[in-house]
């Protein structure tokens, strides 16, 4: 029977590649998006169908514990219990700390970090009971090294690492692995829209002299979602072209 995978933030640039890769690998894939993206999600679903992928979309504000619980309950009832969770939802509210307001801080922490707890908590018990689970948290190179103007984002992404390592210890003997991936710069609509000088400056600082393709991030996730990674837990995979080495 196909394993069921939920990808939060699943209709974004990286999320799309994750969804299609997991579907190619034989998973039944469910994408999540914010309720405000419902219209875009319908177009996204049709575009994936045209590519040969039948991917369901469930809306929920994953920064809300109650809405996350509702979503997972509906997925379980309509599709089945979730075997693979990819926590990919994320936003930025970049400001220098001098200009950062509480709203900027809370928005990023709520979506980028609290959502990881909110959704994982809904699937955790079932994974333990069934003796199998894969939880993959999408962090960032900036959660390892920090980034000017991203105190909120860097803190949230760094928090994922502690969460991952702690939870991995609780699931290890039960067949549930918990890992993190830390991408560097990825070629998405957002990075392609950058000023050429800014983009070229970023690329010059990457040892591989290019940004990652979304499919390269998805390939790493596919490995962590599969059986061959069953002995890996509590780990962080840096997929950053050598931008940060630790």
Swiss-Prot record:
Pathway the protein acts in: Biopolymer metabolism; poly-(R)-3-hydroxybutanoate biosynthesis
EC id: 1.1.1.36
Subcellular location: Cytoplasm
Identification of the protein by name: Acetoacetyl-CoA reductase
Family membership noted in the UniProt record: Belongs to the short-chain dehydrogenases/reductases (SDR) family.
InterPro entries, sorted: Acetoacetyl-CoA_reductase, NAD(P)-bd_dom_sf, Sc_DH/Rdtase_CS, SDR, SDR_fam
A single GO cellular-component term on record: cytoplasm
Coiled coil: none
A molecular function (GO) term: acetoacetyl-CoA reductase activity
Gene3D superfamilies: NAD(P)-binding Rossmann-like Domain
Domain of life: Bacteria
Annotated NADP(+) binding sites: 12-14, 88-92, 183-186
Any Gene Ontology biological process: monocarboxylic acid metabolic process
Positions with a binding annotation for substrate: 94, 147-150, 184-185
Active site: 153
UniProt KW Ribosomal protein keyword: no
